[in-house]
């Protein structure tokens, strides 16, 4: 993603509504290097702190900011200990946010990466789709299906479900509200309430 940031520069569009590549780079840097400020995403009382720190970081030279973020969290930063697990999906989604907004299509991944994506999707789909009004059955190509929002076992008993199929990476994007995801959808799409990342 670092190379793509550098290639496109700070003013390229992203799929994150209203955000440019600079805004996304600032978000990623703050999230990984200033967890005290990043908490403002979830804790309303800290949102002012997040905005202040984000404005300060946004003033940095874009290429230096991207390179700094690309090196990962500082050694003493507690985020470093959960970096791979915490960032795998977020970095994938945000990388695609940049790619898709700039005319690039889906990428091909190895079987190992697809399996890793599937493992994360199994965990995250339950959270990302928890507000759905019908069960959501996701069928990643070549991998076991994933059922989310099946509050009453309906997915096993009936057909009042939403079915989504496609490559596992596309299902991750779709689960997190990215309409650019290349998936096939059957059923009431409005019943599948997706999260954002």
Predicted features, each with a name:
Residues 1-31, 35-40:
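An N-terminal domain-cap segment
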Residues 2-5, 53-57:
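Soluble acyl-CoA-dependent acyltransferase catalytic core bearing the H(X)4D motif
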């Amino acid at each position: 993603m670092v190379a793509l940031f550098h290639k496109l520069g700070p003013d390229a569009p992203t799929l994150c509504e209203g955000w440019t590549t600079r805004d996304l780079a600032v978000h990623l840097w703050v999230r990984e290097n200033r967890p005290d400020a990043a908490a403002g995403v979830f804790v309303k009382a800290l949102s002012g702190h997040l905005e202040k720190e984000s404005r300060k970081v946004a003033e940095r030279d874009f290429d230096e900011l991207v390179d700094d973020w690309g090196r990962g969290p500082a050694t003493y930063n507690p985020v470093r200990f959960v970096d791979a697990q915490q960032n795998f999906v977020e970095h994938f989604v945000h990388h695609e946010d940049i790619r898709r907004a700039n005319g690039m299509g889906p990428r091909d991944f190895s079987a190992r990466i697809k399996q890793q994506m599937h493992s994360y999707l199994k965990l995250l789909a339950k959270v990302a789709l928890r507000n759905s009004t019908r069960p959501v059955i996701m069928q990643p190509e070549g991998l076991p299906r994933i059922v989310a929002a099946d509050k009453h076992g309906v997915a096993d008993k009936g057909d009042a479900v939403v079915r989504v199929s496609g490559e596992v990476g596309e299902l991750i994007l779709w689960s997190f509200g990215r309409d650019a995801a290349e998936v096939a959808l059957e059923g009431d799409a409005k019943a599948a309430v997706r999260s954002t990342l």
